[in-house]
């Protein structure tokens, strides 16, 4: 289910009260489930397109065209920040913090089932799609053969997973992280920057969620086209269970923490680079405004 446009299609986390009642599992246990779900492979497949997405993010938020040096700085910051080693440590910690022993046991049983294995394989297949093909799928230009019964199942799956809500949540979280990191790297006060990014995101959240619902259903239908109706029902049953809801809550928390860390790292590196470029530009402009340095003429010697 990965591509940047829908890095996650899993539900938002449970309430703080429910999380407080959990007895988190250890890191080794979480890492085993993380491996079973092929999270690393799916995230790694999404990272290659991140520099282009970050460039678009900045190009869409400026009224003046970015210079080649600024675009290069954005690209370099994204390449260095959006890496699996930056993602994995915070992601695994968050994953472990949102899991308990019963959830792990039932999630492992589901992932070991035929339907669970086919779901993971389908997720990996979606992760290998190019951005161009992913866009075509979400726009309906590429579609899987469907039936009214399957359409109903995918509508239920999208609602059960709250895929639109979670995708928007990740996009806004990462955007805020990049903005905050850029402020820190530029030696600006991060508080107002973070608040503006948060308010901007909240004002558009509902519209973004509604606009994503149908594209997300198309994406799921295409990715799971080789799963039978029985498989889809098995997946839906797990997702609607208590353990399933907790598992996808942990999955979302994991991805949210990992992408926040990468976004923050990207912003900090970018802020430093943009500050250096601005200082160099200011020095150049100052030098151009100053009158050229001339050597004073030799004093006239008195005539003897």
Regions found by a protein language model. Give the residues of each.
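Bacterial N-terminal signal peptides
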Residues: 5-15
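N-terminal Sec/ER secretory leader and immediately downstream segment
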Residues: 21-131, 266, 289
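An acidic-aromatic pocket/loop used at catalytic or ligand-binding sites
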Residues: 29-44, 132-178, 269-304
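Second-shell loop/turn segments in exported
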Residues: 36-43, 75-82, 91-95, 106-109, ...
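Outer-membrane beta-barrel domain signature
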Residues: 122, 127-135, 139-142, 146, ...
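Extended amphipathic alpha-helical interaction segments
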Residues: 127-225
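A cross-kingdom marker for long, charged
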Residues: 198, 206-304
């Amino acid at each position: 289910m990965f591509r940047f446009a829908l890095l996650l299609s899993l539900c938002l986390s449970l309430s703080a009260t429910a999380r407080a009642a959990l007895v988190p599992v250890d890191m080794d246990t979480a890492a085993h489930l993380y491996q079973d779900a092929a999270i690393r492979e799916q995230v790694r497949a999404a990272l290659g397109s991140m520099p282009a997405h970050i460039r678009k993010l900045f190009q869409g938020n400026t009224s003046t065209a970015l210079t080649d040096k600024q675009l290069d700085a954005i690209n370099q910051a994204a390449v260095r920040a959006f890496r699996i080693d930056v993602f994995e440590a915070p992601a695994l910690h968050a994953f472990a913090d949102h899991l308990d022993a019963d959830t792990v046991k039932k999630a492992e049983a589901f992932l070991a089932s035929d339907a669970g294995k086919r779901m993971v394989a389908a997720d990996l297949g979606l992760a290998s799609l190019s951005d161009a093909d992913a866009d075509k799928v979400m726009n309906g230009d590429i579609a899987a053969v469907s039936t009214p019964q399957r359409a109903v199942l995918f509508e239920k799956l999208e609602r059960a997973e709250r895929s639109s809500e979670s995708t928007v949540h990740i996009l806004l979280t990462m955007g805020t992280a990049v903005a905050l990191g850029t402020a820190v790297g530029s030696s600006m006060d991060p508080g107002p920057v973070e608040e503006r990014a948060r308010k901007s995101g909240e004002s558009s959240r509902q519209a973004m969620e509604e606009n994503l619902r149908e594209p997300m259903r198309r994406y799921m239908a295409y990715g799971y086209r080789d799963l039978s109706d029985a498989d889809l029902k098995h997946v839906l049953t797990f997702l609607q269970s208590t353990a399933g809801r907790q598992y996808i809550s942990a999955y979302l928390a994991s991805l949210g923490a990992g992408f926040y860390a990468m976004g923050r790292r990207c912003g900090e590196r970018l802020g430093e680079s943009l500050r250096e470029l601005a200082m160099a530009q200011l020095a150049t402009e100052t030098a151009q405004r100053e009158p050229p340095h001339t050597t004073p003429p030799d004093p006239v010697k008195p005539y003897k």
